């Protein structure tokens, strides 16, 4: 564990492909254990939204970095939910639209953008007990995390989860299109040059295809609590 003053900080890394359930279970566990939850995917989505709203090409690394350097990305807890703010505006729904979802992989693959976000993520993890989820937390962002989890699930089950999540948010997209988008996203995330989606050698793999959220939460919580006792 990392030491902060007289106390020790716990770092939990949860990685996996799109819609494997990372954010959902991470939020619940963080709430139950009193940890800070850091949604790294939301940070890259916010960067993508910033580019979109300023009519900047998603591959224009220099322009996007300049925009980010002059923007603020914040997380706030409101009514029991984590909200994402960009320059003081709540963009929690805006960053989940199909447009942003389809292009976040391109933005997150840009070296300087990734370096900037990783720097911010490590800074956050050095101040609190954290649960951080993403694609490269256990391999790149927090390689020394005490607990590393790698969640997987079938494309069909992940597409259904995203479809239902979109419905709740009032976003309409065909299920087959979502399945295709997930397959494309998986390929991009796994084959990008910088910090590709990859299971850390010391990560524990959990297949969530046939597990309920409560079951996944229970399994990961047990792993964390065992580590705390050591």
Swiss-Prot record:
Q: Which GO terms describe its biological process?
A: nucleobase-containing small molecule interconversion; pyrimidine nucleotide metabolic process
Q: Quote the Gene3D superfamilies the UniProt record gives.
A: P-loop containing nucleotide triphosphate hydrolases
Q: Which Pfam family would be a valid example here?
A: Cytidylate_kin
Per the record, the domain of life is Bacteria
- Catalytic activity as recorded in UniProt: CMP + ATP = CDP + ADP; dCMP + ATP = dCDP + ADP
Q: What is its EC number?
A: 2.7.4.25
Subcellular localization(s) per the UniProt record:
Cytoplasm
Q: Detail which positions bind ATP.
A: 16-24
Give this protein's Gene Ontology molecular function annotations: ATP binding; CMP kinase activity; dCMP kinase activity
Q: What class of enzyme is it?
A: transferase
Q: Which GO terms describe its cellular component?
A: cytosol
Q: Which UniProt keywords apply?
A: ATP-binding, Cytoplasm, Kinase, Nucleotide-binding, Transferase
Q: Which family does it belong to?
A: Belongs to the cytidylate kinase family. Type 1 subfamily.
Q: Which PANTHER family match?
A: CYTIDYLATE KINASE (PTHR21299:SF2), CYTIDYLATE KINASE/PANTOATE-BETA-ALANINE LIGASE (PTHR21299)
Q: Which HAMAP family does the entry link to?
A: Cytidyl_kinase_type1
The protein's name is: Cytidylate kinase
Please state the gene responsible for encoding this protein. cmk
């Amino acid at each position: 564990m990392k030491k902060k003053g007289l106390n020790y900080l716990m770092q939990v890394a949860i990685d996996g492909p799109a819609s494997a359930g990372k954010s959902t279970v991470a939020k619940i566990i963080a709430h139950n254990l009193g940890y800070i939850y850091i949604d790294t995917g939301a940070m890259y989505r916010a960067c993508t939204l910033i580019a979109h709203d300023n009519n900047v090409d998603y591959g224009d690394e220099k322009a996007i970095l300049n925009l980010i350097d002059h923007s603020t990305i914040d997380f706030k807890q409101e009514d029991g939910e984590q909200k994402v703010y960009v320059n003081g505006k709540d963009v929690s729904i805006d960053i989940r639209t199909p447009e942003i979802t389809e292009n976040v992989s391109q933005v997150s693959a840009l070296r300087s953008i990734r370096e900037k976000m990783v720097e911010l993520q490590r800074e956050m993890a050095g101040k609190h007990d954290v649960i951080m989820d993403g694609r490269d937390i256990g391999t790149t962002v927090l390689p020394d995390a005490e607990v590393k989890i790698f969640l997987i699930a079938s494309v069909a089950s992940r597409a259904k989860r995203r479809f239902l999540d979109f419905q709740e948010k009032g976003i309409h997209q065909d299920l087959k299109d979502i399945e295709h988008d997930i397959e494309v996203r998986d390929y991009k995330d796994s084959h990008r040059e910088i910090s590709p989606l990859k299971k850390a050698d010391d990560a524990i793999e959990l297949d969530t295809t046939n597990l309920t959220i409560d079951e996944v939460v229970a399994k990961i919580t047990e792993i964390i609590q065992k580590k705390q006792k050591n």
